[in-house]
């Protein structure tokens, strides 16, 4: 965050008003991103956060409120993806994956962070969609728009 804060004043006003910062599972998480919220809009990537911490952050979490506030009146965006379906082959589609249990079973975070083709886990979809009243959800998947359409259609049944 310090490097970004250092260069931020040298950016044009147009650049300062369009840059967003996203948490990730390697460089920095939500707490480090929040150090930038007074200058830049923050994008919450809920999958990155889960991979980094094992936590299913909730829309009522104070950190998410601070992320929303960083958008200064504009509807925020969150990023949503789920671990690949060919990694969690036997996982129940109606159960949230438990990071501690997966690690105990020998799964590696590097594999769990890879994006799936589609949003195959109903429980994870329900969790992600709990943010929909507050933020736009950008689906990150291998099937791109097809995955977004299928997710949207699943909410209208």
What are these regions (language model features)?
Residues 41-47:
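Conserved mid-sequence domains
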Residues 26-28, 47-53:
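Short acidic, Gly/Ser-rich segments with clustered Asp/Glu that frequently serve as metal-coordination loops
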Residues 1-41:
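Active-site acidic/histidine proton-transfer and metal-coordination neighborhood
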Residues 40, 51-157:
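Histidine-acidic metal/acid-base catalytic patches
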Residues 19, 45, 137:
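Conserved, mostly hydrophobic/aromatic
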């Amino acid at each position: 965050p310090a490097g970004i804060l250092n260069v931020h004043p040298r950016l044009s006003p147009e650049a300062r008003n369009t840059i967003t910062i996203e948490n990730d599972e390697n460089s920095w998480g939500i707490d480090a991103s929040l150090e930038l919220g007074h200058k830049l809009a923050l994008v919450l990537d809920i999958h990155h956060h889960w991979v980094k911490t094992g936590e299913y952050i909730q829309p009522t979490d104070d950190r998410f409120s601070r992320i929303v506030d960083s958008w200064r009146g504009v509807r925020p965006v969150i990023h949503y993806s789920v671990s690949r379906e060919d990694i969690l082959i036997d996982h129940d589609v109606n159960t949230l994956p438990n990071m501690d249990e997966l690690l105990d079973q020998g799964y590696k975070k590097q594999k769990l962070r890879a994006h799936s083709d589609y949003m195959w886990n109903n429980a994870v979809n329900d969790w992600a969609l709990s943010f929909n009243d507050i933020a736009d959800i950008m689906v990150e998947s291998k099937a791109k728009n097809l995955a977004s359409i299928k997710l949207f259609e699943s909410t209208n049944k």
